[in-house]
Amino acid sequence: GGANVNGPKWMTKENLDPAVLVRWQSEIEQTGFDAECTALTDRAGKEELRHTLRSSQTLVRAFELAIREGHLPLEWSHLLLLTDRSGIVLSTAGSPDKLGHARRIGIERGTRLDLPHAGVNAIAMAVRLERPSHVRGDEHDLRLFREWSSLCTPVAADGRTFGFLGVCCPCPGESSDVELIWIEFYLQVLKERIARHCPMRRRMALDRRFGEYGLSPREREVAHYWAQNMGGLQIASRMGLAESTVRSMIKNIYRKIGVSDKGQFMRHFLA
């Protein structure tokens, strides 16, 4: 229906190639998957979890910051999930009772929600297809997911997927279009916030802006460090330059940008 208003096109089980579903089903069956289990028990190992949390640090911090910044109606009966690129849960958010329920059914940091471990669900689908996915109640393989509708979208910036953002909501039979539009808006807001807090993304955006002022590649590098509040000496040793060279480059940068001190420079770029 009207679910894809200005948003990504959601992949559903219906518009999936039947051959793909058959392949998935046989893959799931080979793992000795128990559709009737009352809680998910598959977790990432300690080492694997430590590794994925370390490499997804920026993403997790951005997610938690976005949640804290609020304007997201958390009294909503929804559970938000952030996973790494393979579907391992990195962070969860929602009302205390939703989080409590999630824990009871085994959804917490480290839970595997990918296809072999959790059957067909929106997170598993999005991980496989790298596309926004929507799975309704009864379409889930796991009985414990059948009272939920799940939606999931890749968190991508500059052509690279960093992880996945999922929403589970209790479904009275069918998710209404209004609900879907809401969730889509919600996911969009979170994705933008996450991208905004991603240093890589910020670095590229800053780089473009420095370029617009005609800064040379070396000046751009100095400007990056300066924007991170590094001192002249620190920048000099990092770049293998004399401090006096860095100082004169900073003067040049100010001239090109049209600012006269560090405060103005910071305000100009960190607004």
Model-predicted segments: where are they?
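Intrinsically disordered, low-complexity terminal regulatory regions
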Residues: 1-111, 125, 227, 263, ...
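Sensory/regulatory domains in signal-transduction proteins
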Residues: 85-91, 95, 105-197
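A cross-family signal for key residues in well-ordered alpha-helices
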Residues: 124, 184, 224, 237, ...
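Regulatory hinge/linker segments at domain boundaries
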Residues: 198-218
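Strongly charged, low-complexity linkers/loops
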Residues: 210-216, 223, 227, 244
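Pre-recognition alpha-helix immediately N-terminal to the DNA-recognition helix
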Residues: 220-221, 264
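Recognition helix of helix-turn-helix DNA-binding domains
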Residues: 229-264
